[in-house]
Amino acid sequence: MKTLVIISHPSVDESGSQQFLIQALSDRSLEQVTLHPLEKTYPDGVIDVKHEQELLKSHDRIIFQFPFYWYSSPPLLKHWQDEVLTEHFAFGYRGNKLEGKELGLVLSIGLAEKEYQTGGQEGYSISELTKPFQAVARKTGMTYIKPLSIFQYAYMSEEERMGLLIRYQQYLTLKKPDSLKPREEWVIAALKETATETLGTDHSDFIIEQVIEHIEDNRMELDELRMHIDNYHE
């Protein structure tokens, strides 16, 4: 699976969250991920429509990555949509070039997650506020993926940022990023790769083996719990 990450940010080089996400992609991930920063590619705002459409056709998952300004995207990403997602390409007669692909969002958000719910400062959920993107996916025949929302990156601890790094890599590369089992398998594969790279350091190998065993034991417990629940409903 190939993923195209379309980044829109008026000052991407000065953005702490965007630079963290860009640097979070390991060499292993970059083989299947294309980063495409719009403002750096088109500083004059003139979109190469044919090039953009070819990029879309050559990837399976399309990600819009941007700061969530006024419940929408920065202006260049909206302009990109107007120019690139044209009739006869993305919709309409023979406009099926995006059909079967996936559309996801990576949103950097300045407020706390609790504010995006009934009773919160914003009063609406992220799911409600991103309905226009869900509509784009529906109109173009793409499958919409639940957004990866990053709340208050500047206040995240080092541990929280490490968790974000893993979620981000999984969101871009896993076939089912919302499913628990593929996420577990991804972590186990990454740990085994780390063990191979640190071969010869017995202490590190032991810790990694213990973590893998713990994950697999938890999975077995979850499978047993699901079995009991299924039997109860029968």
What are these regions (language model features)?
Residues 4-6, 34-36, 63, 104-106, ...:
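Hydrophobic/aromatic beta-strand patches that form the interior of the parallel beta-sheet core
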Residues 16-20, 47, 75-79:
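Generic recognition of short, well-ordered alpha-helical segments
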Residues 102-104, 110-183:
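Conserved, surface-exposed functional patches that form binding/active-site neighborhoods
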Residues 1-31:
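N-terminal beta1-alpha1 ligand-phosphate binding loop
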Residues 42-50, 157-159:
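Structural motif
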Residues 30-43:
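A short beta-strand-loop structural module common to alpha/beta enzyme folds
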Residues 150-234:
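C-terminal and late-domain segments of enzyme folds
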Residues 51-134:
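Helix-loop-strand module that forms the ligand-binding subsite of alpha/beta enzymes
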